[in-house]
Amino acid sequence: ICVRLVGSEMCIRDREYFITNPEDERVADFIGLSNHKLRQLREKDGGDMAPYFIGEGIIVINRALTVEHKLLTLIISEKFDHSQITTTPKGCNIFRCSPSVLEAITGRPNLKDPIGTFLRPPQSTFEELTHKANLIVLTESVQNPTNMGMVMRNAAAFGVDAVLFDPQSCDPFYRRAVRVSMGQVFSLSLIHI
């Protein structure tokens, strides 16, 4: 491991940084992730997090990488061995965070699973999905991200080709929905109708 100093922070290798201050601007977008109402507002259309989605856990992150979603940032604890992540793309920032930073981000000083920020994939059109899909699920007013995650997980298990979700349904890429689906949401074609 190559260690060099960058300003007052330690850079463990290119694009991997040790963050000790919760006020560090590099982690500002992640502070308060445990406040789900605020996070959901930020993730809605027009919010600052709308072009991104958050994946938590090794399984979820690896599944997102398998279908070639672009990993932008990886937040890990001081002792996390990121060799468990199948591949870390070039240009991905890795923030190895102290307990105080992790507590500001998640509400807990310890982080068992990594947190990744990905670029949200483009949506297919209704015509593209319905033309090639044999089995489609339509959600109606599934507002709870946990329930949406279970819908995605079950849809993948039953070989569903596409999931259409109505305007009253929550985003299947909400952090909790992605986690509950165990990353199965990435194997489905989705469209907001």
Annotate each PLM feature.
Residues 66, 122-191:
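RNA substrate-binding interface of SAM-dependent RNA methyltransferases
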Residues 1-12, 191-192:
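Single conserved hydrophobic/aromatic residue that forms the stacking wall/gate
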Residues 59-61, 80-81, 100-102, 169-170:
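Alpha-helix capping/helix-boundary segments
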Residues 8, 13-78:
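Boundary-proximal intrinsically disordered activation/regulatory segments immediately upstream
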Residues 92-98:
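A glycine-rich helix N-cap at a beta->alpha junction
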Residues 82-91:
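Short, aromatic/basic amphipathic alpha-helical patches
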Residues 97, 103-106:
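Glycine/small-residue-rich loop that forms an oxyanion/phosphate-binding "nest" at active or ligand-binding sites
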